Structures are given as structure tokens and as C-alpha cells.
Amino acid sequence: MLEITGEVLNGVMVVSLTGRLDGITSKTYNDKMAEPDYASSSKIVLDCAGLSYISSEGLRAMLMAAKKAKSQNGALTLCAVSPAVNEVMVISGFGALLGVHENIEAAVKAIS
């Protein structure tokens, strides 16, 4: 299961993820990111404090959102990544690609 909430902070869409982002829940993620409030945002922070697991399909979903943000002259970055999820980010190289920040404030500042 994946719970997704969003709020705008200093012009940046902060998307909080809670649960698992995998082959089953990536459709939920993609559908939410396609909603007008989310899709119109070119600067996105994914708050991963509540994300307990991510699979390769979840990484792909994040990458697609990052590419979309970049095509709109924006960026997507991550924050508050748990040790288990961070390990996947480091091994896959996604941490370096997307950027991982300690907290929401640091992530928002990095892409503002």
C-alpha cells in the first residue's frame, strides 16, 4: 500500500510518500503525479520519511517524474530517506542522479 499527500511550500510541490513503492503501487504513484495539481509542478520534493520499501519499478516511476520535471525546466529531488531505501538509492545510483537531502527544508532550498 502507498499513501501520497502533497502540499506546496515556497513554490515547490512537496509529495509525502508513506508505505511501499513497488510494481503494485507504482500505478498509484503515477496516477497521483498525473493529477493537475501535481503534473503542473516543475519543482518537486519527494519526502521519503514514510517510505519503507522501493523496488526497481518504483525507481522507474521516480525517474519518469524527474524527467518530466526536467522537461519543464524544473527538478525532482528526495529527502528524509530511510536507511533501507537509501541503500537501494546508493546501489542503483539514483541517489546521485536525483539528489538526497536530510529534510524537506534542505530539499526545497536546493531546488528553489
How should these model regions be labeled?
Residues L9-N10, A49, V81, E105:
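Conserved catalytic submotifs in the C-terminal HATPase_c
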